[in-house]
Amino acid sequence: MYVFDPTTEAGLRLEMAFPQHGFMFQQLHEDNSQDQLPSCPPHLFNGGGNYMMNRSMSLMNVQEDHNQTLDEENLSDDGAHTMLGEKKKRLQLEQVKALEKSFELGNKLEPERKIQLAKALGMQPRQIAIWFQNRRARWKTRQLERDYDSLKKQFESLKSDNASLLAYNKKLLAEVMALKNKECNEGNIVKREAEASWSNNGSTENSSDINLEMPRETITTHVNTIKDLFPSSIRSSAHDDDHHQNHEIVQEESLCNMFNGIDETTPAGYWAWSDPNHNHHHHQFN
C-alpha cells in the first residue's frame, strides 16, 4: 500500500502512479499457470519422460491397492460386506456351513473353486477369498494354542519326572554314603579285633614261657630246701646209690673178664656162624 507524501518529488509520483495494476496482472498470470505443466522441449528431459510416466502409473496402482484394501477391511470375518455408512451384511447360516465344509476339504482356495463357491452361494469371489483368509488365520491360531497346550503338558510331565529322578538320585547317594561309612566302620572293627588278638597271643606266649620256666625254678628250689631239711638221709641215699652203681660196675667188669678169657682159650673159628647152605645139605642127608 502506497501513501501519498507531498514532500516527494513529482517524478517519483509519476513512476509509482500505477504499480498495483501491473502486480495484479502478474498474479493472475501466475495463478493460471499453476494448473498447467511447463512446456519444455523433449530433448531437455533426456529420457525422463518414461520415468515420469512410470511414476504416475505406480502412484495409480498404489491408489487402487489402497482402495482395494479399504474394501477388504470393510469385510468382516464372516464375509459380511460393509460400505461406508451402511450396516454389515452378514452371511446366512447355510453359506457359512458350506464355506466351513469347503474349508475342511482344503484350506487353500484355488481360483476355480473360489468362482464355483461364489456362484453356488451367491457371493462375490472377493468375499470367498477374504473368508478363507480369515478362517486360515483363526485355524492357525487355534493350532498354535493346541500345540502350546500339548507342549506345556509335556513340559510339566518332564519337569515332574526330572524332580522324581533327582529325588531318587539323592536317595541313592545317601545309600552309597551309608554303605561306605558302614564298610569303614566294619574295617575299623576288624582291624581293632585283629590288633587285640595279636596282643592277646603275644601275652599268652609270654605267660607260657614264664609258666614253663617257673616249674624248673620251683623244682630246684624244692630240692635245695629238701637237702637243707634232711641232709643225712639224702647223703645216705646218695651213698647207697653210689655203692649200688659200683657193684653193678664190678659185675659188668667180671663178666667182661669171663668173656675175654673164653675168647683167649677158644679158637676163632669155633664162634663162626655155620653156613646156611651147609645146614641145608646136612638136613637133606638126614
UniProtKB/Swiss-Prot annotation:
Record-level GO cellular component terms: nucleus
Protein's job: Probable transcription factor.
Chain positions covered by the region annotation Leucine-zipper: 144-179
Protein name as annotated: Homeobox-leucine zipper protein ATHB-20
UniProt-annotated location(s): Nucleus
GO biological process terms held by the UniProt record: response to auxin
Family designation: Belongs to the HD-ZIP homeobox family. Class I subfamily.
Gene Ontology molecular function: DNA-binding transcription factor activity; DNA-binding transcription factor activity, RNA polymerase II-specific; sequence-specific DNA binding
DNA-binding region: 84-143
Domain of life: Eukaryota
SMART domains noted in UniProt: HOX
UniProt keyword list: DNA-binding, Homeobox, Nucleus, Transcription, Transcription regulation
